[in-house]
Amino acid sequence: GQLSVIERGGRKALRVRHAEAASLTGLGPLAYWPADPAWRLRARFIPHPPGRTIAIMDITSQQAAKPNPGMVEFEHSGQTYRLEALEGDAGGLFLIFADRTSGHDSYGAGRYLDTQAPAADGTVTVDFNRAYNPPCVFTDFATCPLPPPENRLDLAVTAGEKRYARPAG
């Protein structure tokens, strides 16, 4: 196994990971919508003033202020939508969103999506085919951030990972 120290809400805890845990070895198949180029969108990154944060609630009802570098604006089916972005890896963006499939065909609390860093001209590719479920789908011990109210899309994103069905037993 592996131990690591995590901090949540100003409190420290130990996280234990074990490669042969039943939650990993008993993992059922993942389901995805068929890849669709119509969900690979060219978006516009709209930066916020430096230092801006956004309140993000996690699945345990803990709230934290997270760096919010800007929002992405995209069009789909003739409508314009915006998602507030968090800082991602390597200068990229981390998007937490819910949509009209949430709780039906996809995980009820929302999904995640990582992007590369916005280009110099302010464009960024938002490929919903790469949307994935948060870790709390697979374990009761994860403290997953939830979509802020601004990131609840009035749109059915029929792309990316679908709702996970835990194996019986």
What residues fall within each predicted segment?
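Surface-exposed beta-loop interaction hotspot
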Residues: Q2-K66
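Generic recognition of long tandem-repeat/solenoid scaffolds
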Residues: V5, K12-V16, M71-H76, L95-F97, ...
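Short, ordered beta-strand-loop transition motifs
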Residues: I6-R11, A64-N68, E87-G91, A117-G122
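Short helix/loop capping segments that flank catalytic or ligand/cofactor-binding pockets
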Residues: S23-T25, P50-G51, L83-E84, H104-S106, ...
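Mid-length scaffold segments of soluble, non-membrane domains
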Residues: A65-S102, S106
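Secondary-structure transition/turn motif
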Residues: R15-A22, F97-T101, N129-A131
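Extended, aromatic/histidine-rich regions of cofactor-dependent oxidoreductases associated
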Residues: R100-H104, Y112-A117, T123-T125, N129-G169
